[in-house]
């Protein structure tokens, strides 16, 4: 029989302090950015924001202050406002009448008029109910941006009575900004329904264009069936770039198809004639227009959702001006520590080439950014690796012209013309394991690669079109290719690379790694904002992204965390990609902490340590989930817990007998035993609780594994939720008993075995 003991005080803290959570959530911030050297007032829409008192913005040079929290009014509160408004209207009406004989005149004051305006604003908000509950609550913030603050995306979190919210993007820019008045969208026009079919076919007449001067960033929120327009003066010969940021601000919307604000841009002349339009840029959902102005005059930039949907969280920023824009680079990467000459394509650029070294930087992905005068370009990714590098030659589009390469190598090339292919010859021996990996789409290239490996006689050995990289959470079309195969015999082999859609052009660059396996791993931990009560325990999802066939166990540990945090079940089992572990909070209250999770594994006899990247598990269009990387893993401990509490959890995995039952003994303080029940939280298929029996100094738990379910060797963690069922009201005996959550216990490692369970 396996036994585990927990200190009584800690068990009390875990069960008593933790209740069913209402997780604070933010859905949008508007405006979603500001100019450095200025201050901006923003609205943050979300849910469970009660007690919002502090805002956290990543990076230096920005400071946010919560100025007000606005919760939607209840029906009774709204009626009270209506009654007060009626009294004031009656008073105003009476003040205009001649008073009756002997009666004092009714005086309607300036203060009364001001109060009516305040009431009208509040009642307007009541009549325009928020589209959905998840963005119904509002926090008002004042953000100061230093003049020397770095340009780029920051992450904004609110600290509420329920803890930290998820992060959301707030952009720091360098251009003048204009923001439209915030909007409210009625529920009938929510993002799922969008505009009516009639409005989609012929949207209502848009409001008059807003007059702006270039260069500028304009901020707005899209409403259903409408288009926002901006009029500006431009000079003939200017290359004006119009770039929308919408999906970049809010990557995924869970309750919409498509699963984001799909912005569409149109450029018109003064008479309304369409000059250019776009609803994407290559595979990027956010559109970009570059247009050479034909003559001096007035022009109109217009934005709308592609199917005329709209809601408060359909937030956009449009950058307009004769500004530097990088559209592609070549090569897409280089060797770490070596200088690389990079050719750059785009508009309004100061140079066509740059010489970069990224001296001292380890392998990874870094942005290439240019400045022209006072303005900064967009950033494009550039990859550094430690392997030897070469460039694909011209004229290797046929097998007999294949370029011979020696492993290991990274080939930098491009499919320069539609229908073109590139062939590479490698020599190997029987049993050699090789990896061929294309990195293109993950570096901003539109290439949709295909890899095919054949032997000298033309027989296909391996083929791959797309492979899914869980680390590329912002890509919905994973278009890069990966082959891992073992060569059947000694000889020459030919690797063909082409575009699956037979497209090509100078922007269709790629990096092709050809090598023996380089086993490695990455980690993601979610959510990126974690809230738990003092002394309580909560589950955490850890995802292992295994590279080049690495299948070993990964030991997990906390870094930069106070020693009284406890990580339980701290390992990703060999051969598995996911595990749920638990984190137990200390007893003391603390400010939000930025901590780290690390993973350690033995690879080819060497210890390798990787730091987990915090991520949000975002839902797209009701169905798809993506791990989107965030800047920090923030933990908030709430409330007071027992002092000096500690856990003593299982030191070895519980061995569960397949097709049988395994007893597990948990020590629980007597005062928690009465009526306490346990339930498995998202257990593996086939593992269940057979019985829970109170005993003098704990709980006797019997776990069962179905005979046809889990295979021997399966490892992981079991997470138990404790609860009580409250007796139903005697006056409403037909109603079922209510489950009262008590908390979550630290993870119990397990292993499924054949035969008798371990003792």
Q: Model regions: which residues?
A:
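Ser/Thr/Pro-rich low-complexity tracts
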Residues: 18-213, 217-222, 304-310, 314-315, ...
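Acidic, Ser/Thr/Pro-rich low-complexity intrinsically disordered segments
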Residues: 21-95, 105-106, 211-375, 384, ...
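C-terminal luminal/periplasmic domains and tails of membrane-associated envelope-modifying transferases
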Residues: 532-534, 646, 654-660
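Bacterial N-terminal signal peptides that target proteins for export
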Residues: 1-8
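Hydrophobic h-region of N-terminal signal peptides that target proteins for export
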Residues: 9-18
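Short proline/glycine- and polar residue-rich coil/turn motifs
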Residues: 131-135, 281-283, 293, 475-477, ...
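C-terminal segments of large proteins
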Residues: 15, 571-574, 588, 654, ...
């Amino acid at each position: 029989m396996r036994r585990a003991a927990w200190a009584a005080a800690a068990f009390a803290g875990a069960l008593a302090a933790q209740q069913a959570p209402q997780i604070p959530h933010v859905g949008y911030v508007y405006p979603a950015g500001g100019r450095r050297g200025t201050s901006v007032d923003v609205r943050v829409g979300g849910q469970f924001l009660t007690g919002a008192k502090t805002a956290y913005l990543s990076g230096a040079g920005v400071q946010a202050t919560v100025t007000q929290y606005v919760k939607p009014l209840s029906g009774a509160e709204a009626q009270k406002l209506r009654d007060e408004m009626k009294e004031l209207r009656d008073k105003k009406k009476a003040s205009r009448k001649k008073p009756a004989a002997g009666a004092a005149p009714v005086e309607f004051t300036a203060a009364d008029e001001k109060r009516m305006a305040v009431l009208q604003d509040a009642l307007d908000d009541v009549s325009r109910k928020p589209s959905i509950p998840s963005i119904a609550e509002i926090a008002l913030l004042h953000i100061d941006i230093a003049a020397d603050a770095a340009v780029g995306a920051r992450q904004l979190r609110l600290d509420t009575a329920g803890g930290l919210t998820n992060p959301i993007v707030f952009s720091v820019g360098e251009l003048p900004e204009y923001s439209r008045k915030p909007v409210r969208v009625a529920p009938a026009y929510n993002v799922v329904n969008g505009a009516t079919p009639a409005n989609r076919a012929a949207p209502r007449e848009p409001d008059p264009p807003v007059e702006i001067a270039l260069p500028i960033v304009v901020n707005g929120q899209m409403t259903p069936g409408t288009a926002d327009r901006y009029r500006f003066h431009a000079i003939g010969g200017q290359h004006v770039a119009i770039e929308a940021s919408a999906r970049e601000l809010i990557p995924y919307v869970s309750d919409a198809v498509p699963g984001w604000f799909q912005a569409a841009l149109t450029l018109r002349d003064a008479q309304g004639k369409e000059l250019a339009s776009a609803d994407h840029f290559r595979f990027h959902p956010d559109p970009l227009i570059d247009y050479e102005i034909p003559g001096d005059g007035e022009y109109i930039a217009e934005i709308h959702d592609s199917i005329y949907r709209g809601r408060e969280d359909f937030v956009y920023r449009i950058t307009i001006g004769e500004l530097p824009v990088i559209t592609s680079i070549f090569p897409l990467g280089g060797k770490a520590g070596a200088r690389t000459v990079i050719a750059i394509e785009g508009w309004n650029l100061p140079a066509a080439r740059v010489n970069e070294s990224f001296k001292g930087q380890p392998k990874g992905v870094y942005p290439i950014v240019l400045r022209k005068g006072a303005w900064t370009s967009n950033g494009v990714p550039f990859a550094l690796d430690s392997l030897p590098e070469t460039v694909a030659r011209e004229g290797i589009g046929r097998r007999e012209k294949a370029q011979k390469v020696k492993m290991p190598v990274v080939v930098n090339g491009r499919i320069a013309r539609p229908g073109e292919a590139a062939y590479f010859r490698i020599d190997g021996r029987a049993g050699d394991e090789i990896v061929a990996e294309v990195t293109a789409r993950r570096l901003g290239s539109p290439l949709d690669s295909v890899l095919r490996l054949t032997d000298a006689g033309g027989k296909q050995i391996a083929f791959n079109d797309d492979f899914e990289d869980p680390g590329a959470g912002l890509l919905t079309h994973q278009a890069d290719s990966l082959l891992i195969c073992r060569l059947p015999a000694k000889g020459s082999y030919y690797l063909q690379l082409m575009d699956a859609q037979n497209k090509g052009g100078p922007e269709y660059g790629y990096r092709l790694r050809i090598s023996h396996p380089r086993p490695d791993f990455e980690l993601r931990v979610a959510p990126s904002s974690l809230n738990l009560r003092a002394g309580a325990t909560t589950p955490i999802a850890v995802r292992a992204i295994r590279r080049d066939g690495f299948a070993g166990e990964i030991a997990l540990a906390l870094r930069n965390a106070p020693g009284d945090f406890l990580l339980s079940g701290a390992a990703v089992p060999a051969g598995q990609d996911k595990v749920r572990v638990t984190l137990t909070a200390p007893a003391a209250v603390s400010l939000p902490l930025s901590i780290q999770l690390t993973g350690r594994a033995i690879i080819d006899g060497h210890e390798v340590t990787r730091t987990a990247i915090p991520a949000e598990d975002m839902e797209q269009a009701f169905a798809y989930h993506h791990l989107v990387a965030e800047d920090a893993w923030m933990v908030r401990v709430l409330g007071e817990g027992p002092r000096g509490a500690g856990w003593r959890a299982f030191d070895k995995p519980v061995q569960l007998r397949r097709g049988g039952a395994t007893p597990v003994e948990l020590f629980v303080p007597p005062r928690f035993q009465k009526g306490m029940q346990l339930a498995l939280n998202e257990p593996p298929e086939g593992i269940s609780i057979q019985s829970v029996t109170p005993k003098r100094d704990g709980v006797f738990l019997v776990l069962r594994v179905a005979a046809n379910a889990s295979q021997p060797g399966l490892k992981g963690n079991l997470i138990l939720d404790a609860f009580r069922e409250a007796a139903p009201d005697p006056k409403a005996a037909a109603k079922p008993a209510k489950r009262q959550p008590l908390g979550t216990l630290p993870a119990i490692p397990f292993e499924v075995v054949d035969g008798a369970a371990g003792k």
